[in-house]
Amino acid sequence: MAQVEYKGTGRRKNSVARVRLVPGEGNITVNERDVRDYLPFESLILDLNQPFDVTETKGNYDVLVNVHGGGFTGQAQAIRHGIARALLEADPEYRGSLKRAGLLTRDPRMKERKKPGLKKARRSPQFSKR
């Protein structure tokens, strides 16, 4: 028998997370490692569990994630975005609560590019009067 599986793709900064939700006990696996081994801070783990808290589905699904690019925070938020999209695929009635919590919106903020003649995106070289 084919197993029921809900998929969602989440993005944040340079991170892309491919998320699969499978009915289970609430285990989260990121890149074939437990989420507590993969993410260094408890706050990030709480952050990516937010879609389950909003929809009151904590412990109903096992989460399998493949994520690459960016740092820990960007990856955690990409996973959160992917989980929200996968939950929406599982039950379209979650749309209202997920939308109100802002979990379906892709955060558009990206790193600003470095400009020529400047040290960073906006930081100019030190000015010397003489």
From Swiss-Prot:
Keywords: Ribonucleoprotein, Ribosomal protein. Pfam families: Ribosomal_S9 (PF00380). One of its GO terms (cellular component) is cytosolic small ribosomal subunit. Residues 111-130 have a biased composition (Basic residues). Residues 98-130 are annotated as: Disordered. GO terms for molecular function: RNA binding; structural constituent of ribosome. InterPro entries: Ribosomal_Su5_D2-typ_SF (IPR020568), Ribosomal_uS9 (IPR000754), Ribosomal_uS9_bac/plastid (IPR023035), Ribosomal_uS9_CS (IPR020574), Ribsml_uS5_D2-typ_fold_subgr (IPR014721). It comes from the Bacteria. GO terms for biological process: translation. HAMAP family: Ribosomal_uS9_B (MF_00532_B). Belongs to the universal ribosomal protein uS9 family. This is Small ribosomal subunit protein uS9. It comes from Staphylococcus epidermidis (strain ATCC 35984 / DSM 28319 / BCRC 17069 / CCUG 31568 / BM 3577 / RP62A). The lineage of its organism: Bacteria, Bacillati, Bacillota, Bacilli, Bacillales. The gene is rpsI.
